[in-house]
């Protein structure tokens, strides 16, 4: 048994087939099959039901994959846990929802690098649910997400900022009433696969507002550009860190009961580098306190 074989077993479970696991692990289908046969021989158990065209994990195989994941996570933590006892250095894999990538995250990372120049931050964009899965699998150290109503049991979170949702409208619109504008103008919808998109849909339903959907987008920049071009109105988060060159659009409050999205830094409770995660959280809080994207002066 080797760590490489355990990683392959985990990949088969996560990817659903030998072929997909081979692609994810950058090896051949035959190599995956051979590694799994070696594990079955060494452990003297049947990991897969091979009566189907694509072998499926048996219940025992699924249990062994879960145990293998814990072993691989502990193995991967050996060096980072030792490094974390000294000066902060090395890579941190940080996930971030796309709405934070043009203000909050770049400002926070630049602040972090001023304090710890031996740290390299590797950013992975994604939706909140995707990033939580990547943290759980050990592919990310932490992520900036829209915190859901309930976090998985093994996760911890650190509050970063509350961002009220507001209406974006073209500057030439005839009214500043968000309810009127939502009913009269085409609606540029925030991606419904995102937690924010689901919050927006729930708020529209609660207020019995029927909108005329014209398009559905994920990025704040793309949505703002469409609104600025006069193609409709949209509901998006009010950024806790303003971008350098905001689009010329109206930003209208949805009122005191408008939805608010909570940005949090989330990580696994057993993360082997707690000091690194804490440093990232502090950098994010510093960026929020600054409130606008402005690259820091290297001289301090």
Language-model region placement:
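Secondary-structure junction motif
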Residues: 183-207, 273-281, 287-297
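Beta-alpha-beta core module
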Residues: 152-158, 162-163, 221-270
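Flexible hinge/capping segments at coil-to-helix
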Residues: 154-192
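A short LG(V/I)-centered, amphipathic sequence patch enriched
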Residues: 40-57
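Central regulatory/effector-binding core of bacterial HTH transcription factors
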Residues: 89-151
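Short helix-boundary/capping micro-motifs
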Residues: 10-28
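Alpha-helical linker/hinge and terminal dimerization helices associated
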Residues: 42-43, 64-86
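A late-sequence structural motif
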Residues: 104, 251-294
């Amino acid at each position: 048994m080797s760590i490489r074989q355990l990683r392959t077993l985990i990949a088969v479970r996560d990817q659903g087939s030998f072929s997909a696991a081979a692609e994810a692990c950058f090896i051949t289908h035959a190599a995956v099959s051979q590694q799994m046969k070696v594990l079955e021989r060494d452990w003297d158990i049947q990991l897969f039901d091979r009566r189907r065209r694509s072998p499926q994990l048996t219940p025992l195989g699924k249990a062994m994959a879960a145990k293998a994941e814990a072993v691989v996570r502990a193995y991967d933590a050996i060096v980072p846990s030792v490094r974390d006892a000294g000066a902060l250095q090395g890579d941190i894999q940080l996930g971030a929802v796309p709405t934070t990538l043009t203000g909050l995250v770049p400002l926070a990372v630049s602040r972090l690098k001023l304090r710890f120049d031996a740290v390299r931050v590797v950013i992975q964009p994604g939706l909140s649910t995707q990033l939580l899965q990547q943290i759980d699998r050990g592919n990310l150290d932490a992520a900036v997400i829209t915190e859901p109503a309930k976090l998985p049991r093994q996760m911890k979170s650190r509050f970063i900022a509350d961002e009220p949702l507001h209406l974006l409208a073209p500057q030439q619109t005839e009214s500043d009433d968000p309810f009127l504008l939502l009913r009269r103008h085409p609606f540029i919808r925030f991606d419904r696969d995102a937690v924010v998109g689901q919050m927006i849909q729930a708020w529209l339903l609660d207020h019995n507002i029927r909108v005329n959907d014209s398009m559905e987008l994920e990025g704040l920049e793309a949505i703002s550009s469409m609104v600025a071009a006069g193609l409709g109105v949209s509901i998006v988060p009010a950024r806790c860190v303003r971008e350098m060159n905001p689009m010329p659009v109206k930003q209208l409050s949805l009122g005191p009961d408008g939805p608010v999205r909570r940005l949090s830094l989330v990580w696994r409770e057993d993360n082997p580098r707690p000091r690194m995660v804490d440093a990232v959280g502090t950098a994010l809080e510093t960026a929020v306190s600054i409130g606008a994207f402005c690259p820091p002066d290297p001289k301090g």
